[in-house]
């Protein structure tokens, strides 16, 4: 008879099942004694606040203060030493050590209750602040209660939860186990709050526009389609709020912004998620140059207020990284100039005609679509050869009109627009332009987009007749911009993939 062996996966599953069985038995015993999930404990302190306020107090000063606290949190570590134990509790603000002794608790409680609790259980504690012999701020427990019994164990302390997909699927576990993840999403919250404060202080009005639309618009992207049963019509999840926000500017709301969720039925990558968050804003009586100035001010303010410095360290996965300085003026280059800068063998004449630009693209092995104009080819060359080279904050201006259906044409060269995209760390972070407010030109460009869609371009825009009607009522000179919040948080937290900064990113369902 051959010897049977088990794989590590089987061993782990068996171990997990055994531990869960034991924890369920403990829960059953707790139920027999009363409600094991009480909801009458109220804390008055958070761990981080206690460290901030009392972290510099000496042992003698803490004794003199006699500070009584009520805290609650999850048991992350525990050391049982006979009649006394140390444990670490984790709450929303951090961690703090508690000191529990048998003699401070009701008779029998320490051995029959406390010692049988598990890592991951949530407890409420009352006690006095003190400093241990090793100098650690701690709570000497006078009362402790079990508030929630955890039926599943925490990840192993040293292995943690390191698998990228597992962290995304079980974000709750990732947040419990990984301090860096908690910091990332705390910074994300601060970024959103900082953006909102910045625009509110400049007298922008926050608004909400439809997330389900009859005609998707505002960006070149493939939309998600749904069906509205009551109206019996197909609708589209928003790919951008732009056309609705500009309708509001027509209506007299001259400075508007929306922190919005957009949906694009496209690929998933380290910097793309089908559902993502942006800040999009519009201001009347401004142009794209004003927006570039505003963007510099915004990013500089956010970095200083949230990170405490205008210089940040950023590294893509596997790379050494670089220091990005928001304190210096941002570089500004036209698209053509940037191509010439990073492609020394290319001349201005090479980008002057469709045929010569196609020859450059062919030499660079860039795939082109049928029916593309000169502007499309130049943009493709830029995206393939320049975009990833833009590491320090850089505005790329003068985007071709062929790829900018909503932007105002440049007064000097109508083949390009008063548009920019902002790049940092080799990635696009923002897109802004002086808005096209010529209704007749907009109607023509919409028709060009329809022609491109009929020729097979799934990402070309739909014709939005109502938006053209709105422009016919008069849109004041306006500039508008969108900034990707997910990518900005990636930058501020030195995250390598967009999934690390979205709490619940899109994932394929697991097979059972």
Curated annotation (Swiss-Prot):
Pfam families: tRNA-synt_2, tRNA_anti-codon. One of its GO terms (biological process) is lysyl-tRNA aminoacylation. Mg(2+) 2 binds at residue 428. The keyword ATP-binding applies. One of its GO terms (cellular component) is cytosol. Its cofactor is Mg(2+). It is found in: Cytoplasm. Binds 3 Mg(2+) ions per subunit. Coiled coil: none annotated. Belongs to the class-II aminoacyl-tRNA synthetase family. Homodimer. This is Lysine--tRNA ligase. It comes from Aeromonas salmonicida (strain A449).
